[in-house]
């Protein structure tokens, strides 16, 4: 059995970075070093007082230390990691672009009063879960040792559990909506028409190449020649889901 340090080192880069940021943001809030009032999304504060960090920090606070926080962090560690190691194996730039597309979509939808959310971490995790469930629709999932179901239905089951435990329905539903929006334009529409409107931009490939984050097969951008190609920020090993 690998040690916690070895397990952490083996994680793919984007899921590792996002999960780490979510964990330490919650730790800082729990220690009262950070206050949630400085993190939540508030467009009047963003545009009138130029508190632009809120466009990012709203994605990193999942919940106070609780079962709800633990479940969401485990979803990143399990389903986000399996998605990045499986369907997005050797496609770090594509995975990063999915996260960026999801973040932008959530920020835009949050302008609409019906979809307004102060914290977008739970919608982002729900988006990852939805995309994973579409890529692996027939996997068997056991929920709390009580219910077994196909993974295709897992996002909806988690939505139902949110309602049962008294949480708001909207954050999870918002994540599912954005996840389907991504999956439609990235997978379903290209399969049906042969045309892709959600191709990973070259600047995302440049970020991955410049900072040597993970790996991108057939990248249009070459990484810098200097230094050891095995090093990098949040660099992890890649695995296939069906190994």
Swiss-Prot record:
Keywords: Endoplasmic reticulum, Membrane, Stress response, Transmembrane, Transmembrane helix
Residues exposed to the Lumenal side: 42-55, 116-157
Subcellular compartments: Endoplasmic reticulum membrane
A GO cellular-component term linked to this record: endoplasmic reticulum membrane
GO MF annotation, one: signal recognition particle binding
Spans within the Cytoplasmic topological domain: 1-20, 77-94, 179-243
Tissue specificity statement from the Swiss-Prot or TrEMBL entry: Expressed in roots, stalks, leaves, immature ears, embryo and endosperm.
Membrane topology note: Multi-pass membrane protein
Tagged with keyword Transmembrane helix: yes
Lineage: superkingdom: Eukaryota
Chain residue ranges for the region called Disordered: 219-243
Annotated TM spans: 21-41, 56-76, 95-115, 158-178
GO biological process, one term: ERAD pathway
Major place of residence: endoplasmic reticulum
InterPro entries found in the cross-reference section: DER1, Rhomboid-like_sf
The keyword Transmembrane helix is assigned to this record: yes
Induction notes from the record: By endoplasmic reticulum stress.
Note: Associated with ER-derived protein bodies in endosperm.
UniProt record similarity statement: Belongs to the derlin family.
Function: May be involved in the degradation process of specific misfolded endoplasmic reticulum (ER) luminal proteins.
Protein name stated in the entry: Derlin-1.1
Classification lineage: Eukaryota, Viridiplantae, Streptophyta, Embryophyta, Tracheophyta
